[in-house]
Amino acid sequence: STQKAIELAKKYGTSVHILHVSTEDELRLCANNPFPNITAEVCIPHLWFSDKDFEQYRGLLKCNPSVKSEKDKEELRKALMTDKIYSIATDHAPHSFEEKQKKYLDCPSGTTSIQHSFLSMLELYHQNYIDLPTIALKMAFNPSKKFKIKERGELKPGYYADLVIVDLNKETLVKKGDLFYKCKWTTVEGMKFKSSIVYTFVNGNVVYNHGKITEQPKGMLIEYC
């Protein structure tokens, strides 16, 4: 299906953004692409887990598309610093813990990832898969550019101050009691990240401060160019 979408985009000169690339074969289709209107996105679960992890997490790890082999995961990580990957997303799709305990074929697809998505990417930075400017490029600037989001995705005068301040040298242990998800589960529970989130700003307001939500919601309608 990915190959067909790319062929149609080339044939008709239209744009296509391939979501949730999960295999080495899909990466090959995106390699050496002379068409700037054809781009691809990778999600946190496919960068972080492989089919080896199903025995431990079972239905909690079920997502669509499914996580693939260890080799696929490694190739996705290696592609982060190349133009094969245009953007990085969370694919955050929570379901209740009870729903995810059903038999694999009966439980819904989707994992929780948004709270620890940035920490996951910083961990890959520590492992030398990606540098800090590219994390910002592919998690903020490129998505805002692709979807023509007005005054977002950059730190510049006149733009909304949506940003994160991190401590690259302070570890974070993921504990259930620290989760902000209503479903109260995550596949990274018990993991230790080398970095931590210190502050989060939304529209110039501090909404997260050293592990605590500090403000009432400060969201605004997103405008498009």
For every predicted segment, state its role.
Residues 26-32, 216-225:
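C-terminal/domain-terminus segments
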